Amino acid sequence: MHKDLKKRIYTSIILFLLLYAMAMNNYILGYFLIIIGIYSIIEFFNIISLIPKIKRVKYFLINFFFITYIFIFCTLFLILSSYLYLKIVIFIILLTCVASDVGGFVFGKFFKGPKLTKISPKKTISGAIGSIIFSLTLISTTTYYLTNKFDLGIFIIGLFVSIGCQLGDLFISFLKRKSSIKDTGKFLPGHGGILDRIDGMLIGVPI
């Protein structure tokens, strides 16, 4: 099995556990988010500390911003998921994040073509397009199945979620290149860290 495909499978497992926790109990979800949040912060600290010649004040401000962001992200996620309707919405958005990641990988490997950016040389324009196509297809199909109608608003949300996922991925890729590292951590031995798996969700879900 292709190494990158394995990473996508790990991403799906993490998302499945998160969705299962949401469906079962908010306390379980809370513990899950705490674990993910702590590991994300630790990995982020390590990445920033490896950036050459970074000033102490800048290092402190970047880390402070990330801690605040993760805290707000996890808190709002937990609060919103306590409402059934919003829980369904979050469920659809998380599935869209998965579709964005898988779509980008499949299209990028199959069609290849021009690179998207120097920040992440493995990313291609075809992959970015595939990411959007997969996301819009999934979110539109799921919404139609649940409501028996096409919702333009949800369609637009899916577009922004897909773009957000790709921006999150590029952001973490940018930091890894600056730090000269391949993976954000070793939480999943041989397959990277937590940030490697949830980078897209950090921007995609809040949108």
Per-range role (PLM):
Residues M1-L159, I163:
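Membrane-embedded alpha-helical bundles of polytopic integral membrane proteins
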Residues K112-T117, R177-K186:
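Juxtamembrane helix-boundary/capping and inter-helix hinge elements in multi-pass membrane proteins
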Residues K118-I129, T184-I198:
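Membrane-interface alpha-helices at helix entry/exit sites of multi-pass transporters
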Residues F174:
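LysM (lysin motif) carbohydrate-binding repeats in extracellular/periplasmic proteins that recognize
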Residues R197-I207:
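Final/C-terminal transmembrane alpha-helix of multipass membrane proteins
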